Every structure is written in structure tokens, then in C-alpha cells.
Curated annotation (Swiss-Prot):
Species, as recorded: Ligilactobacillus salivarius (strain UCC118) (Lactobacillus salivarius)
Functional description taken from the UniProt entry: One of the primary rRNA binding proteins, it binds directly near the 3'-end of the 23S rRNA, where it nucleates assembly of the 50S subunit.
Region Disordered: start-end pairs: 119-143
Protein's UniProt keywords contain rRNA-binding: yes
SUPFAM superfamilies: Translation proteins
Self-association and partners: Part of the 50S ribosomal subunit. Forms a cluster with proteins L14 and L19.
UniProt name for this protein: Large ribosomal subunit protein uL3
Amino acid sequence: MTTKGILGKKVGMTQVFTENGELVPVTVVKVDSNVVLQVKTMENDGYEAIQLGFDDLREVLTNKPAKGHAAKANTTPKRFVREIRDVELGEYKVGDEVKADIFEAGDFVDVTGTSKGHGFQGSIKRNGQHRGPMAHGSRYHRRPGSMGVIINRVMKGKLLPGRMGGNRVTIQNLEIVKADTENGVLLIKGNVPGANKSLVTIKSTVK
């Protein structure tokens, strides 16, 4: 099965009405300025993929190799460069612009992003554990609980406090509500991972 993919920037969430009058929550993703920087083939690279660049970057913030790589595609250096595998290579050439119209309303996609970081958090917030009783005589409120018995070490996999969020997350089978080519925007039903203005990768669903 061939895959279609595009890079975008999460703008935020809003609501739209369907033709039936149903109110649908959607995430707005800006997907303009996607350019094919490189086409990777089985002969040269050992696998097939296209390399997309997204979000123009000022030249003062880049280096010579990045400028030269972008110049081969007749474009400016890009802030984000990602690969999309399992595509139909015959449909792409270096320098082509990939737009929102590769998807249409009703398509299902997988969206990958970086979840919001929450810093160091305790077991209750991080792992969804129950707290202890809050009564006057209790001395156990929000602690992580027993470390186990007998052996003098903590078992692997024990749910403990630590850094929360900031992970690569993929949400599968999200529906495209609208593909606005004129404004370079995709409206995706529901929420997608990450904070506003963060990078998301949108690909055809695999399931």
C-alpha cells in the first residue's frame, strides 16, 4: 500500500458544523510550504522515500550544507526535514511542492507529534495512581507506594515520579474533515499530539 504524507504546524482547535448540522471539534494544521528536497531510491539509498522540507528558515540561521541541499530543489532552507516512506516515487520530483490537496475530506490519517512536556511530576499525575487517605491520622497521601518485598532493589518497570511528557506520540485513524488548499490548511477531527506551533507529521493510516 502506498503512503501519502505531509508536514504541518499545529495551529489550535476549533469547531465546525457538518452538512447535517452536527458540531465537530477539529484541530487546524497549517501545511503550506512543503517541498520535496530529495527522492531516495532503492539503488542509491537501499530504501524508497521522499525527503520533505517544511517551514522556511532565515539563511542566517542555517549553514552551507543545508543551503546547498535546499538550492538543488530551488527553495529556501527549511526548519524541519523529514522522510516519508512507502510513497509512489513516480509522483514526486525534487523541487515539487506538496499541498493539502493530497488528502480530501473523509480520508483517515495517522498524526505524529511530540507531546506536551510537564516537567518532573509525581506518581499520581504521571501514572494515574490513587492517593492515600487524607484523614488526620494518615501519614500516606501522595507517595509512590511500596517498592516491593524481600529483594533489596527496585524492580524494573516500577511506576515512580519522573519527567512527564515530551515524548513522540502517534494517534491513528483520525478523519480529515476538510482540506483547504487555498489557505494551506487541514482540519482534522479530534485532537492531535503536541503544543500549538509544534511540528506534526500527517500520513495515510496504516490500519
